[in-house]
Amino acid sequence: MAEFINQIPGYEKGRVQRITATDEVSESFIVAQMASDLRKKWNTSVLCISLDGHKEAIESLIPQEKAVGTVYVLDQNNPEFKVVLRKATGIINRRFVRALIISGAERLTAKYFQNHPEKGREWIASHLEGLSRGMGIPVILVRVHEDQSEV
């Protein structure tokens, strides 16, 4: 699993990366590993937003070693994209966060774009690309593989 984490492209500033996990446990592990890795590599803080209620799991998997940055984990159980984006932008601006990881990304389109998932994915992608390029940070979307929904 650690080799997989190191091979993930997406640690580039100003880029949105999508990653698919096999199950919810590996999703939490991937998020925690990437957050820890980014914190160590860049000596900066990382914001993780859990859209599927895995805040405690992610926090418990993040190594507690001394590092310059902090990993903030936000639990957003009712994911309306505009609310998630607004909260993320506020935290990024106030806390000097230089990477954003969103877990449970398949839920972003579920609420408002059920009838038009492709339109929802395009809308979300354009807003995340704007956030990523505008602030110069990587945005990483981690989702559990499900055939019927895709972000």
Task: Annotate the PLM regions.
Residues 34-37, 123-134:
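Catalytic-core regions built around general acid/base machinery
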Residues 129-151:
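Phosphate-binding/switch region of NTP-binding enzymes
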Residues 43-114, 118:
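Conserved inter-motif catalytic segment of the P-loop NTP-binding fold
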